[in-house]
Amino acid sequence: MTKEWGAVDLLCANAGILRDKSFAKMEVADFAKVLDVHLNGTFYCCKAMWNGMRERNYGRIVVTTSSSGLFGNFGQANYGAAKAGMIGLMNVLAEEGRKNNIRVNTISPTAATRMTEELLPPQALALMKPESITPAVLYLLGEDAPTRTIMGAGAGSFAVIKVVETEGINLPSVDWTPEAIAAHFAEISDMSTAKALENAFQQTNKYVSQAAARAGVKL
């Protein structure tokens, strides 16, 4: 591809299919095919462009998730799993690409397409022009784009979606029981303390710091 078209600095990976069925009726082939097109297909595209972006110290990648993967939707276990996988892929590529000025983001589009035309009434579809997604994608591909951002877009609405973790609590070993979790669940699940973590180690460091504070251990 690069031999024919030259350097590729911008990539939007958006290929997809549907094989909707309830989980009880879904065949292994239905699950595997959707993951192959959505998740593996995105991997192949990113992999093909990655080293060139690293060599040039510049790249912008947008992968495509879905509200089905972020929030769930009946009959789309395969599609939801594939689209949720995009978030993990984005998180790692954004971390690895940071030093080479490669910014990786995710778009969660809601638009009138062949995949949605049978799911919504005509008056709703009329509001959901695919063109309403374009500004968000172009922003995420821009020189001043953020990185590791999930942006929702549809019908002229734009929002940022985050995976967050509550502050939680640290329990003494005597309380490492399901009963103690139940007793403290309101505090554990208190979303007023929720934060978006920057990477996997930040979570590990938080848990270790909480445990050290309880034990009086200086790290």
Language model feature labels by segment:
Residues 22-23, 30-35:
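Substrate-binding pocket helix/loop in short-chain dehydrogenase/reductase
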Residues 124-216:
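C-terminal helical subdomain
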Residues 1-6:
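Conserved amphipathic alpha-helix within the SDR
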Residues 26, 72-80, 92, 120:
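Active-site loop-to-helix junction immediately N-terminal to the catalytic Tyr of the SDR YXXXK motif
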Residues 53, 71, 87, 92-102, ...:
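Active-site-adjacent segment of SDR/Rossmann-fold oxidoreductases
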Residues 66:
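Residue(s) in the substrate-gating loop at a strand-loop-helix junction
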Residues 46, 82:
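Active-site helix of classical SDR
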